[in-house]
């Protein structure tokens, strides 16, 4: 489940740290979160799609590592990102 160009640009504009930012950790986590949510809805209807499930687990692991990095650098940025994306209950 890939993201369209317009959707990517919208995510970049929403989560960028400075005006020319396109690849900060916040932007990467936002893109991964969107892809994860799309893929999880796909898997609810396609239970036996094991290759997509494996890709989903890889994306979740990547997002977890990126969030750990953000948390180690700044607890404030981490909590703001978590609240903005609503990924922790």
From Swiss-Prot:
<keyword id="KW-0689">Ribosomal protein</keyword>
<dbReference type="Pfam" id="PF00312">
    <property type="entry name" value="Ribosomal_S15"/>
</dbReference>
<keyword id="KW-0687">Ribonucleoprotein</keyword>
<comment type="subunit">
    <text>Part of the 30S ribosomal subunit. Forms a bridge to the 50S subunit in the 70S ribosome, contacting the 23S rRNA.</text>
</comment>
<dbReference type="InterPro" id="IPR000589">
    <property type="entry name" value="Ribosomal_uS15"/>
</dbReference>
<protein>
    <recommendedName>
        <fullName>Small ribosomal subunit protein uS15</fullName>
    </recommendedName>
</protein>
<keyword id="KW-0694">RNA-binding</keyword>
<comment type="function">
    <text>Forms an intersubunit bridge (bridge B4) with the 23S rRNA of the 50S subunit in the ribosome.</text>
</comment>
<comment type="similarity">
    <text>Belongs to the universal ribosomal protein uS15 family.</text>
</comment>
<dbReference type="GO" id="GO:0019843">
    <property type="term" value="F:rRNA binding"/>
</dbReference>
<comment type="function">
    <text>One of the primary rRNA binding proteins, it binds directly to 16S rRNA where it helps nucleate assembly of the platform of the 30S subunit by binding and bridging several RNA helices of the 16S rRNA.</text>
</comment>
<dbReference type="InterPro" id="IPR009068">
    <property type="entry name" value="uS15_NS1_RNA-bd_sf"/>
</dbReference>
<dbReference type="GO" id="GO:0006412">
    <property type="term" value="P:translation"/>
</dbReference>
<keyword id="KW-0699">rRNA-binding</keyword>
<dbReference type="InterPro" id="IPR005290">
    <property type="entry name" value="Ribosomal_uS15_bac-type"/>
</dbReference>
<dbReference type="GO" id="GO:0003735">
    <property type="term" value="F:structural constituent of ribosome"/>
</dbReference>
<dbReference type="GO" id="GO:0022627">
    <property type="term" value="C:cytosolic small ribosomal subunit"/>
</dbReference>
């Amino acid at each position: 489940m890939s993201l369209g160009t317009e959707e990517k640009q919208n995510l970049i504009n929403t989560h960028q740290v400075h005006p020319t930012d396109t690849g900060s950790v916040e932007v990467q986590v936002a893109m991964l979160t969107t892809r994860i949510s799309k893929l999880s809805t796909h898997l609810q209807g396609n239970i036996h799609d094991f290759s997509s499930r494996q890709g989903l687990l890889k994306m979740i692991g990547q997002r977890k590592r990126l969030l750990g990095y953000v948390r180690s650098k700044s607890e404030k940025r981490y909590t703001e990102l978590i609240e903005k994306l609503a990924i922790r209950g």
